[in-house]
Curated annotation (Swiss-Prot):
Record-given protein name: 3-hydroxyacyl-[acyl-carrier-protein] dehydratase FabZ
GO cellular component, one term: cytoplasm
Keywords linked to the UniProt accession: Cytoplasm, Lipid A biosynthesis, Lipid biosynthesis, Lipid metabolism, Lyase
Membrane found in the keyword field: no
């Protein structure tokens, strides 16, 4: 990433994201450069609840959850720059996914590295280039579009 490296542990992540078990999919932020990009980590454990059914004899992390992990990293990048005015009632939503490609399976024991680069912000929509890697090889990639919405009911 580059010059200013910001590292966020799980405690800080929990203050920035509303997600909790079993859908919190970022364990640590390794690097964060405001207005540029983020490099985060998801340790993929056999204890993940989705492995019971996807697939019992050859567990593979569902592709949609890899995309969700990338979106959570994008949310951390966004919220690290711009703290929500009302965090209890603020949610981060997907509004689009373009060019999603899955290149290799993600299996128990893998460390999924989530690389998200800011591309642009127009009319309330953030656009990111997102790449998930395992052992330096691309597992999935996509362009993500996300927005922040305030709800009227606390989670």
């Amino acid at each position: 990433m580059s010059t200013e490296k910001i590292n966020l542990d799980i405690h800080k992540i929990l203050t920035l994201l509303p997600h909790r078990y079993p859908i919190l999919l970022v364990d640590r932020v390794l690097e964060l450069e405001p207005h540029k990009g983020i490099k985060a980590l998801k340790n993929v454990s056999i204890n993940e609840p989705y492995f019971q059914g996807h697939f019992p004899k050859r567990p593979v992390m569902p592709g949609v959850l890899i995309l969700e992990a990338l979106a959570q990293a994008a949310a951390l990048l966004t919220f690290s720059e711009e703290q929500p005015k009302d965090p209890e009632n603020t949610l981060y939503y997907f509004v689009g996914i373009d060019g999603a490609r899955f290149k290799r399976p993600v299996e128990p024991g893998d460390q999924l590295i989530l690389n998200v680069t800011f591309e642009r912000y127009i009319r309330g929509i953030w656009k990111f280039k997102a790449v998930a890697e395992v052992d330096g090889k691309v597992a999935a990639e996509a362009e993500l579009m996300c927005t922040v919405k305030t709800t009227d009911v606390a989670p």
